[in-house]
UniProtKB/Swiss-Prot annotation:
GO terms for biological process: methylation. The lineage of its organism: Bacteria, Bacillati, Actinomycetota, Actinomycetes, Mycobacteriales. One of its GO terms (molecular function) is methyltransferase activity. Keywords: Methyltransferase, S-adenosyl-L-methionine, Transferase. This is Putative S-adenosyl-L-methionine-dependent methyltransferase MAP_4064c. It comes from Mycolicibacterium paratuberculosis (strain ATCC BAA-968 / K-10) (Mycobacterium paratuberculosis). Its EC number is 2.1.1.-. S-adenosyl-L-methionine binds at residues 129, 158-159. Belongs to the UPF0677 family. It is an enzyme of class 2 (transferase). The keyword Methyltransferase applies. Exhibits S-adenosyl-L-methionine-dependent methyltransferase activity. It comes from the Bacteria.
């Protein structure tokens, strides 16, 4: 990872581009009737990254820019993003049904759950992300005439800064259960920052709180040069179309704690769902296998965790 600690971004640059790519995949999955995110395509258009806009609206076909059979291409993204979208949608529906009335979306990006989910009365949704990302999405959705279906509190702060204080200032009541999600986030945090975020979530949570998270595997023993070259070869045609996303620059490798085990050690109970199982559960196509699936979405695991009464501070 070479991004400096003081780097910032919007939805068209650096890490923010990955949020726009995910929104483009949601736009395709929406058009295919797999999920329903009516704001995904308009937001991608508003960001203005030509490659992603063309893909989102169907002008660019994945087979035109993917290496045939590659597990790293665009072709697998709509299904995998749709599966995780359903997972976290259902996570919030279950949390609300259990009486939780505070939701926190960490690194919210172009997430539109505050606007598209049917929240119960009294629900407060907190979105945390970079100031430029928050400002862009809020402005773009207002121009579309979209209105949140819950009490939406935007928290414009970098997760590398004191976001806990900013969240409390925005009105989070840590004496009441909270439903948190960390979707598409941990791969862009250093291993120690991942632990720090989980510690902060635990400190701000009361028993009965829930956390939905997307966990990436350990890659400490991988040859970083070989991994980088495999990714660059798989995305070579993207660059031919004017789009380059150097995942090696914006993501972190290294030895990570297993998210499920780490949370259990801090008082949470966890239920794990591997990506392959999630895709199968929703009748979605499997992702092509790789020599080492830790570099693909096949290596991702989803956790639903609940904080018990014996948590470890």
């Amino acid at each position: 990872m070479t991004v400096p600690n003081d780097d910032t971004w919007g939805p068209a640059t650096s890490v923010g581009t990955t949020a726009t790519m995910a929104a483009a995949a949601r736009a395709i999955a929406t058009r295919d009737g797999v999920i329903n995110d009516p704001f995904a395509e308009p937001l991608v258009r508003a960001v203005g990254v030509n490659f992603l806009t063309r893909w989102a609206i169907g002008e660019l076909v994945a087979s035109d820019v993917d290496v045939e059979g590659s597990p790293w291409g665009l072709a697998q993204m709509p299904a995998s993003i749709a599966a995780r979208t359903r997972y976290f949608d259902e996570f919030y529906a279950d949390a609300a049904a259990a009486g939780i009335r505070q939701a926190v979306i960490l690194a919210s990006g172009l997430d539109t759950r505050a606007y598209r989910l049917d929240w119960p009365a009294g629900m407060t949704v907190f979105e945390i992300d970079q100031p430029a990302v928050i400002e862009f999405k809020t402005t773009a959705l207002a121009r579309l005439g979209a209105e949140p279906k819950a009490d939406l509190r935007t928290v414009a702060v970098d997760l590398r800064d004191d976001w806990s204080t900013a969240l409390a200032t925005a009105g989070l009541d840590s004496s009441k259960p909270t439903a948190w999600i960390a979707e598409g986030l941990f791969g862009y945090l250093a291993p120690e920052a991942q632990d720090g975020l989980l510690d902060a979530v635990t400190a701000l949570s009361t028993p009965g709180s829930r956390l939905g998270s997307e966990a990436v595997p350990n890659t400490a023993d991988m040859d970083p040069h070989a991994a980088r070259e495999r990714m660059r070869a798989a995305t070579a045609k993207w660059r031919d179309h004017g789009f380059e996303l150097d995942v090696d620059v914006i993501s972190f490798a290294g030895e990570r704690h297993d998210v499920g085990a780490y949370l259990q050690a801090h008082g949470w109970t966890t239920v794990a769902t591997p990506m392959a199982e999630l895709l199968a559960d929703h009748g979605l196509p499997a992702i092509a296998r790789a020599d080492d699936d830790r570099q693909t979405m096949n290596g991702v695991t989803y956790y639903t965790s609940t904080l018990g009464t014996g948590r470890q501070r």
